[in-house]
C-alpha cells in the first residue's frame, strides 16, 4: 500500500474519525479505533517508508486533578511500562509557543479506557503522568525504533474525578467510528447510566473544541519539522550519511544539463 505521508510529511495518529475530521483533508492520518494491532502494523509501514515526524493527536483522560475538561496537554514524555520515551524537544517547544495555555507533562499508556476514578488515581500514583490515552505509547515506541521525531497534543475529555459509564467505554468501533449497537445494548442492560453518558458526551465536546483551537493555531503540519529539519535529524543520527549526502549533492550540480533526446544543452548563461 502506498504511504499516505511519505518523506517530508507529518503523519498524525488519532483514535477516532471525529478527531481526524478536525485535521482536515490535507493531513495524512492513521485512525486507530479500538484495534491496537492494526494501528501498529499501519504505523510501522508508514515509518519504514519515511516521514518527517509523527504526532499523537486527540482526546485524553486526566490523571492529575488540576487538569480541567477542555484543557490542552502537550506531551514531554510517554510512559510505556518501565520505559520513558521523551518527545522531540524542539517540536515540543514549538507546540508550547503556539499553545501558550497548554499544560506540559507526561502521558501514561493504556490499551483500554481508564474508566474509574480509582484506576485513574492508581495510574497517577504509578507514573506521575498528567494524562492517559490509548495511542501515544504506540507512536512513541515505533517512532523511537525508526529514529523519527514524535510529539503529543491532546485535549482533556474527562477529569481525574470523573468515571466513565460502561456505555461510553464500548462506544468506539475498530475503524474509529461510533459503535451505536454496543452503546444501545449497554443502555438496555443499565438504563440508569444515561445521565452519565450524556454528561460524558458533553464534556467530550469541550475536548474536541480544544483540539480545533489547537489545529487552527498550529497549522496543517501541527508545528512539525519540515523536510530540511528531517534531513538534519537524519544526518545527526547517522554521521556516515553525511558523506553520501555530500557526494549526492555534488553530483546534483552538473555543468551541463543532459537532454536525452539530443546533444548536451549548455546551462543558461554558460
Whereabouts are the PLM-identified features?
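Short boundary motifs at domain starts and secondary-structure transition points
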Residues: 1-5
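Glycine-rich phosphate- or other oxyanion-binding loops that anchor nucleotides, phosphorylated ligands
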Residues: 7-270
Amino acid at each position: 500500500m502506498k504511504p499516505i505521508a511519505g518523506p517530508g510529511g507529518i503523519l498524525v495518529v488519532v483514535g477516532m474519525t471525529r478527531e481526524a475530521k478536525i485535521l482536515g483533508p490535507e493531513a495524512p492520518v492513521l485512525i486507530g479505533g479500538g484495534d491496537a494491532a492494526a494501528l501498529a502494523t499501519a504505523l510501522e509501514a508508514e515509518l519504514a517508508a519515511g516521514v518527517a515526524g509523527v504526532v499523537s493527536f486527540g482526546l485524553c483522560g486526566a490523571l492529575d486533578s488540576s487538569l480541567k475538561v477542555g484543557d490542552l496537554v502537550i506531551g514531554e514524555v510517554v510512559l510505556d511500562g518501565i520505559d520513558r520515551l521523551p518527545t522531540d524537544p524542539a517540536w515540543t517547544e514549538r507546540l508550547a509557543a503556539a499553545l501558550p495555555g497548554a499544560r506540559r507533562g507526561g502521558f501514561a499508556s493504556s490499551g483500554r479506557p481508564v474508566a474509574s476514578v480509582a484506576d485513574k488515581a492508581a495510574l497517577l500514583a504509578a507514573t506521575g503522568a498528567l494524562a492517559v490515552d490509548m495511542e501515544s505509547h504506540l507512536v512513541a515506541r515505533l517512532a523511537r525504533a525508526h529514529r523519527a521525531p514524535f510529539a503529543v497534543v491532546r485535549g482533556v475529555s474527562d477529569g481525574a474525578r470523573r468515571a466513565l459509564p460502561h456505555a461510553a467505554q464500548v462506544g468506539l468501533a475498530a475503524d474509529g467510528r461510533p459503535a451505536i449497537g454496543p452503546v444501545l445494548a449497554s443502555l438496555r442492560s443499565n438504563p440508569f447510566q444515561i445521565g452519565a453518558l450524556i454528561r460524558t458526551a458533553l464534556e467530550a465536546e469541550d475536548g474536541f473544541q480544544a483540539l480545533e483551537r489547537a489545529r487552527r493555531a498550529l497549522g496543517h503540519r501541527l508545528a512539525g519539522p519540515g523536510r530540511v529539519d528531517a534531513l538534519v535529524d537524519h544526518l545527526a543520527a547517522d554521521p556516515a550519511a553525511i558523506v553520501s549526502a555530500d557526494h549526492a549533492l555534488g553530483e546534483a550540480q552538473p555543468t551541463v544539463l543532459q537532454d536525452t533526446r539530443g546533444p548536451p544543452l549548455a546551462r543558461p548563461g554558460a
